[in-house]
Amino acid sequence: DSLGNKGVIRDGDCQWMTAGSGIIHQEMPKASPRMLGAQLWLNLPAKDKMTLPAYGDIRSEDIPKVEKDGVTIRILSGEYEGQKGAFEGRYIKAVYLDVELSACREWSFETDPDSTLFIYMFYGKGIFDPEKSIENPKDVFDERQAILFGEGSVFWIKGAADTRFILLSAKPIKEPIAWGGPIVVNTREELKLAFEELRNNTFIKSHDIRL
């Protein structure tokens, strides 16, 4: 990237980056029929958007893991059962879990009622209401779906098959968002300025760093 960082993401690894005032990076995935990954963007508060860019690699062996009753939880960020995650955002305090659930197993997670919570189902299927049935196809959520949950203090799932999903929860910033391609700011004017800087080669603010 434009900070001079480079690395290889292997099976189970994680990459964390703060774009801040501007960073240009390139990803070159190796072709594979079995590759599975997720890229999540967290919006920074307006007052922190122009912070210095940062980057870090997190190895799979450094990610805390909890295994019990047919459920495996990898704690990427936040805290679960007294264990802190592999990293913590400086500006956004988020719970980020990678969960694997055996078929017919149940798992629940207490959440902050003031936070937004969503999951993305990598594979498998499940129900999210104890009053629903995994035998009823209309009650079951399938793989490759993102699910945003409403207000509440407990997340609950029962797997209708072996299932893997990521869970993310954080307090909403409640600020406007202007998004265009790889850039997220707060207003259309800021977005226009950012693209002008890209065209003029002034987007990267640390001019002593070379690509």
Predicted regions and their residues:
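Jelly-roll (double-stranded beta-helix
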Residues: D1-L211
